[in-house]
UniProtKB/Swiss-Prot annotation:
The gene is PTCRA. One of its GO terms (cellular component) is plasma membrane. Changing G20R: The underlying nucleotide substitution affects splicing; does not affect expression of pre-T-cell receptor complex at the cell surface. Residues 196-233 are annotated as: Disordered. Residues 168-281 are cytoplasmic. It is a single-pass type I membrane protein. This is Pre T-cell antigen receptor alpha. The lineage of its organism: Eukaryota, Metazoa, Chordata, Craniata, Vertebrata. Expressed in immature but not mature T-cells. Also found in CD34+ cells from peripheral blood, CD34+ precursors from umbilical cord blood and adult bone marrow. Residues 24-146 are extracellular. One of its GO terms (biological process) is alpha-beta T cell differentiation. Heterodimer with TCRB; disulfide linked. This heterodimer assembles with CD3 proteins into a signaling-competent pre-T-cell receptor complex. Interacts with RHBDD1. Residues 1-23 form the signal peptide.
């Protein structure tokens, strides 16, 4: 897994490396990167060698500092390439405090340190340290225009959610719907008054509407409207004859024939006409 990551890093940093079948190895150094290891920053330098010897043959890779000392590196490979050649990879970790003592850094490859070898161009680590990429704690960078569009989108979404919330609350607070219009209210009132005072036809003519009920504080001497003393009870224009239906007249006649047996009955009988006389009938 680490070898694949390092190969990808080298492909991005050194896209112009020569490829193809050849008998001479070609080393190259990738741009260094900064890593945080155990709370300390270290610089990692990767060396990629193309066209190395096949497995079984000695093809070491090592680093050398400006003072002539050799530095051992961790080597991956060799691994086969797509064009039939072999590739080798090595990386070196250096403390960030000791970079000045190790520059310039050179990568070597070949049959050995005593024989003929191939080397890279010297790399100055102090200058590379300022431009090296830092993997951990790298701040995210974006254009101000992108941040502005993101803020506008968030504001629109917030307003949409707020409008939906207000609409839902208004529907829950008024489940009966809107009030009827004034014209509808007037028609309903007219229809209600018509039902309270219906007009029926009796004997081929329209009956008059019943009068308003009189208060019950009248005494025995009071006479209902439309009736004179000594006139027949069921005469034309009397109080009881104004009721349009026959059941009401029958109920009144039956109630009039019974005498009140108690004070409560006398109180309710005060609103009824006196008993029907035989001569008046």
């Amino acid at each position: 897994m680490a070898g694949t990551w390092l190969l990808l890093l080298l492909a991005l940093g050194c896209p112009a490396l020569p490829t193809g079948v050849g008998g001479t190895p070609f080393p190259s150094l990738a741009p260094p990167i900064m890593l945080l290891v155990d709370g300390k920053q270290q610089m990692v330098v990767v060396c990629l060698v193309l066209d190395v010897a096949p497995p079984g043959l000695d093809s070491p890779i090592w680093f050398s500092a400006g003072n002539g000392s050799a530095l051992d590196a961790f080597t991956y490979g060799p691994s086969p390439a797509t064009d039939g050649t072999w590739t080798n990879l090595a990386h070196l970790s250096l403390p960030s405090e000791e970079l000045a003592s190790w520059e310039p850094l050179v990568c070597h490859t070949g049959p050995g340190a005593e024989g003929h070898s191939r080397s890279t161009q010297p790399m100055h680590l102090s200058g590379e340290a300022s431009t090296a990429r830092t993997c951990p704690q790298e701040p995210l960078r974006g254009t101000p225009g992108g941040a502005l569009w993101l803020g506008v989108l968030r504001l629109l979404l917030f307003k949409l959610l707020l409008f939906d919330l207000l609409l839902t609350c208004s529907c829950l607070c008024d489940p009966a719907g809107p009030l009827p219009s004034p014209a509808t209210t007037t028609r309903l009132r007219a229809l209600g008054s018509h039902r309270l005072h219906p007009a029926t036809e009796t004997g081929g003519r329209e009956a008059t509407s019943s009068p308003r009920p009189q208060p019950r504080d009248r005494r025995w001497g009071d006479t209902p409207p439309g009736r004179k003393p000594g006139s027949p009870v069921w005469g034309e224009g009397s109080y009881l004859s104004s009721y349009p239906t026959c059941p009401a007249q029958a109920w009144c006649s039956r109630s009039a024939l019974r005498a009140p047996s108690s004070s409560l009955g006398a109180f309710f009988a005060g609103d009824l006409p006196p008993p029907l006389q035989a001569g008046a009938a």
